[in-house]
Every structure is written in C-alpha cells, then in structure tokens.
C-alpha cells in the first residue's frame, strides 16, 4: 500500500492503535518541581498521560520505553522504583512535601533523571540474563492457570450494570411480572447475571434453553465454577438420558439444579420422552437464550427468502448439526414448559422491542456496547490515579474498540454488481459471490469456483495490497495494522456454503501471488463438506488456538456457523461479504469480534494482564447498510427508553461514532464519518447510491 497516494492517511494513523506493548513512562510537572514521576501502562502512553493531565495539566513527558525482556517476559514499574530507591538512593515524594490541594502520588522520585531509568532497565535485563532474583519478572510461561477464576469457592462479583439488572429483576418479580427480558449486548455476562437472578428468588430448578450447543460450556463453567452457585448442580440432556429421575435424585439430596437443553433437544417425540420428568416439574426460572433463538428464527425465515439466497443452500446449512433447528417446533415445546418465571436473554432483540410482547416494566436491562465502554471509561477516570490500582483491575478491562471500515468494493466488482442490478437482481452483493454450483459438484467441482472469479480475485488483491483502487484501502498492507498485530485471525462472512469452498480454493490456488493473504491458514467451517472436518464448535476453536500458539494467522470462512452465541477469542477482523437487511443477524455476526482476549503473565507474588485485542476491525463493503444499521439501532434504543426526540437520537449516533469510529475512502481520500457534518452527509448520500464513484 502506497501511503503517499492516500490523502488524509493521518486520520487512520490516529485511530488505528492495535496491540500495545507494556511501557515505562516518566513525566515532570511544575506543581511538583525536581521530582520525576515513573509509571507503567498497557495502553498507549499518550492516553495514560492525558489521564494524568486531569491532576497535572502542565505535565511534560520526559521518557517512554518498553517494559519487556522478550515476548513472553515483562517487568513492572516497581522494578524501576526499586532500582531508584535501593541502588541510587532516590527519595520518594511524601505527602508532607506537597502544598495543600496538590494531588499526591508516591511514584514521584526526587532528582531522578531519565538516564537513571535507562540504567535501571539495563540492570533489570542483565539481572534476568544472570537468573538473579533481584527483580520480579512476569512470564506467560508461568502464568496462572486460566481456570483459576473458575475454581469452586471463588465468588464472582456483579459489575455495576449487572447488579442493576438483578435489582430490576427483583422489582419486576415483586410487582408480579412473569415474562421478562434482559437486553444486554454480547459479552455483558448474561449467563452469570441471570443465574444471580435465580439466586434472588431461591430457585430450586432452573432450566436454560439455547439454540446453540456450544454455549453449554459457558453455562457449565458459570454454574460449576463460580462460588456464588455452590448449591447448584449442572445437568444436561446426557444426564437426563442416563437417569429419568436425575432431577428428583438431586433434590432429595437438597441440591438445586440448573438444566441446560438446546432447542434441538426439545425437538422430536423420542427426545421429549427423555425429558418427561422435566415437563412434570414446576420450573422456578426458565431462561431462554433469546439472543440466538431470535436470530435463528429470523435468519432461516425471512432472511433466506428476502436476501436473495438459493433455497437449496438451506440443506447445506442444515447438515451442520449446530445450525439445524426447527424454530416453530421448538417454540411449541417451550410453551408446554411449566415455568413460574420466564427470563429471555438477548443482545439483539430488535424485532422483539418493536413488538408488544414486553412492556417497559418487563425489561430488566437495556445495555448496549456503548454503555459498557462508557462504564469502562468512567472507572478509569475515577480509579487509575490511585497508586495501588492497575489498569486490569477495571471490571471492563479488555473490551475492544471496534473500528469500522465502510468501503465500496473494487472497480470491476462494482461494475459487475451494477450490471446484475440492471438485469433485475436485487441482492447483487450476494450474487457477486455466487459459486457456479450451490450443491456439491462431483463432476466439474463447480462448487469450488466463483461465477465472477476475476472480479473477486481483484477485490482480494486490493485488500491484500498487491493492487490499488482509489475507493478501497489495501488495509492488510497498512503498516500500523501490521505493527499493532491486527488482522491476525479474520472471519469472512459469505452468502452460500459453496462460496466458502470457492473462496478456499481461490486463496489456496493463488497463495504465492499475494503479499499478505498468502500468510493465512484457511479454515473452512461452512463449506459443503465442512461438517465432516469440523464436527463440533470446539474443533473450530481448537484449530484457531493451535494456529495462534504456532504464530500462524487464520481466515475462517463461514455463512452463519459460529456467528451466534459462540466465542472465538482470537477473532479480530470480520469481512462482511453478503447481503442482509436484518439488524439482528448483522449485530450477532459482528459482535463475535467483541470478546476480551487477555493474556496473564505471573510472577511468584503477582500477575500482569495484557490486552491482546485492544481493537477489532469490521470491514463492510456495503456502506449504505452500515449506516442504515447504525441508525436503526439508535432509533430502537430511543423508542424503548425515555430519551425520545431527534436531538437525543443525534446525540446517541454521535456517541456511537465516537466509541466505534467509521472510516471511509473516496477517491484516495480517507474520511472519518461524522453524520452531523454536511460533508459527511454528502459522502453518505454518495455511498447510498452504492458503487456510484466509478460512474
């Protein structure tokens, strides 16, 4: 990618940060003369210094250096402090040294200089090589077991917005409400929060129903790991099949139960026989993981009909066990369950909220991702000035910022789509990625070849940086993305199962011709035969983890699989290559990127938590769709809160764009979208006449 040809690239340089190595920083301030403040940070130093400027407006940065021995071993600012005090006899600032009203931190050192920090780091590194125990080192190789936080006995603490949801649940139940909705964005912690609701009503039998089998482990981990739920036993379909009296047997021993079933478990008479005991019992709390149920209900109904997909592709999708649900049958089974209280969980309840099923008194939580980010920022503002607080003590630490690229496709693809539209094709974007055969073609391998291979190859080449296009950034060749270790594990969302096969074939066949795409291992999880290779979601997760452990980048090819309810912590980039008009399907997909991905490095006396995914990238090749989805979500929020009116809607959109910026490229010029500025409104209109820049 030739940065010299791109106007206003500095906008992108400012926004893209990526993974940040830990740094030692130092500053001086005229309010504490002759003292040097020495600290460390796991975010950009400039960001940390701006937070300190609240207390020291005139501070001047004096020093910045990495707090790293090697990629697996870090040190803290405590090691620098130790050297300054013990080796150089530098005195720490004391409260009595300050005039009244000046903020106190004990990390100021009298007459310390930047050269002293250099000497300290040199001594720290030499001591490490000599295997000395002088300093404390933090290593990922000796890190605390990842299951540490899930050992029974550890009490998990509700975050403020989770506690608010539980309090609202209690009030609603006390007021006689029996059909409740917890609307909270993916990654909120709905399983933990809803089980805390079960505790509050002393529920003996809790039934959790989900459309996705792979979320079972999340529920199991929560029930069996958190000390909060020590009275509960986790049961699943297998346990009920082993013993028809599994529930009664546990209740006789005064144990409470949380039963997890999938919608597939509820389908079919033979399976239902295994659950006779369950259907006889009074369920104290029925938790319906509506996040996934609602998304599937829509995606296999209207989406397949209205987004231009071939109906024959539904059979390919249904071959994948974790995708095959008869929603109507499952819904009927849910109605038969005798539940005292029903709690629906959803991160994308847009259709539900625009209906009449839930009144405002039934909605116990209304949390979007921007709300989590604001809580994260507020916590930092109120706590990071304290000497004993670490950045990772923030309960929201590690929630990534999503940077959104709203790009038009390459020129030849745009022209092809224009031709398709003129011929009467409504969903030209999905049609662009149509393979020669939707079904498996054993004669000509048509399911492994795109009808428009030339155009798609050129699109990939521009993304890769091996070709240029004035309206599309070759972001894989952008230096800040490479330096920030972004785009390591990408997801391509494609319209047909066979599109995944065709993409795999194209990327593999021309691997050596790409500058960057050739470095990726292709993981095809939705192809015509994908179910044979990756039978279970954990097979997919394990494959990606193995690649990351081997320092290999990956591209996962999917249609719908793993895009609702699944967590692949390494995923950091999504390329959206299909049509959809469903805010639910769209958000379910893109928020797969927004999980925390944290590495723990430990020493004998403590640990460091490193954020491996500070930013994610959504690349949407339909700018109009991205803007439309943004507006619809903000409008739905407005309608369902007290914040009505156009001014409030504008404020919400402005805040969303601050938290998750949108970047466009037009005629080799980068723009950050501000929908309230006339220039961006003009560009937005230009994007709405999709692919028009070439005409």
What are these regions (language model features)?
Residues 41-43, 212, 261-265, 290, ...:
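A short beta-strand-to-loop transition that corresponds to the Sensor-1 phosphate-sensing loop
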Residues 39, 523-641:
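Conserved RecA-like P-loop NTPase helicase motor core
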Residues 1-156:
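Non-catalytic accessory segments flanking enzymatic or RNA/DNA-binding domains
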Residues 341, 352-490:
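Interdomain helical connector at the RecA1-RecA2 junction of SF1/SF2 helicase-like NTPases
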Residues 112-149, 435-462, 622-695:
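Long, largely alpha-helical accessory region at the distal end of helicase-like NTP-driven motors
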Residues 267, 293-295, 351-352, 583, ...:
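Catalytic P-loop NTPase motifs of RecA-like helicase/translocase cores
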Residues 293-331, 359-360, 365, 370-375, ...:
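Substrate-gripping "pore-loop 1 plus following alpha2 helix"
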Residues 132-339, 475-484, 501-548:
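SF2 helicase/translocase NTPase motor core
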